[in-house]
């Protein structure tokens, strides 16, 4: 998959230098405009494709809708794994998301509760599919460019959280607290309007700055497509560390957030809506902040933010210690565990490691490949990583229901 007009030499650089561009030794062949516009385009795609998810979190909308969205993401990843998704679908997927956002505004104003609930269930599945296809295409395109843009895509996903969080805080000060179907009417209207504007901008920038037309495929890419690549089994053996790391980080994050923290914390300790906004905001802000240092690892101060996949796997297993911490925050009534500052620190640490460990695999996997050197094979592995991310999210959000079988929520009895 080609990206820009000058990206036809991508795999020569990848094969021969294995990431020299990142250190600046190989020299960039992109123009000054491309050096700004391409990263911005991928950031915008990541931002807009995840805004709907973060809007649902910000509105504290029914948790089951989130599970249906993740199910849609997995469906899209399965499609991408067995079917070569045309690059031209990227702007159409983003356009579909924009239309679904408009549908939320109409449904909330005009439908009955049962109709709105049905629309949400269907729409969130389709949103998951559309967002998944957009992210799969963008990651596949970005990771095979002359300069790896996968990290910028990941950064855009992180920006979405803090972007929606800030808008949420501003709207809390401006709009009335009038609710319909237990959702703030004005906030839903404005948040989805902002989602639509971001998606329109993403469509414009992707069409103008990315080479999405298959008719303009370079000779080198045509030759690469005809050339026999490695089998799926060989590619899995070559990239299993990156795939496993991607699965683990997303599985744990979605198992604990938002199902245990903040949902079960709120049930146990009657946390106010404002404090819930702060806790959710901690995840969004620190997930955003942590996605940038790995992209700046060419600077000495940020050098330790990227490391080998072996170290990343070890850190992912250590990250399992968040499970008892989150459970205790729900199950224990001691002042330290009901303290909002401690809860925010807990959520911030989960979020920081989530964004950080999600970004590293896309930046380092190419250098650690032993057999896969062709562009076609690297595109396939990039798709594997996106599939691992979505399957991890899917397994995480559905296994969060396991905690319903344990008495971790403190029962509050009302005295008559």
Swiss-Prot record:
Result, substituting residue 23 to E: No significant growth defects in adenosine-dependent proliferation assay when transporter expressed in purine auxotrophic yeast strain
Effect seen on changing residue 188 to M: No significant growth defects in adenosine-dependent proliferation assay when transporter expressed in purine auxotrophic yeast strain
GO annotations of cellular component type: plasma membrane
Region (Disordered): 1-28
GO molecular function: nucleoside transmembrane transporter activity
Its membrane topology: Multi-pass membrane protein
Cytoplasmic compartment segments: 1-35, 84-87, 140-148, 211-241, 293-311, 367-380
Keyword Electron transport annotated: no
Chief place of localization: membrane
Biased composition (Basic and acidic residues): 1-26
Membrane-spanning residues: 36-58, 65-83, 88-107, 120-139, 149-171, 188-210, 242-261, 274-292, 312-331, 344-366, 381-403
Effect of residue 329 to S: Results in significant growth defects in adenosine-dependent proliferation assay when transporter expressed in purine auxotrophic yeast strain
Family affiliation: Belongs to the SLC29A/ENT transporter (TC 2.A.57) family.
Function: Nucleoside and nucleobase transporter with a broad substrate specificity.
Protein name: Nucleoside transporter 1
Lineage: Eukaryota, Sar, Alveolata, Apicomplexa, Aconoidasida
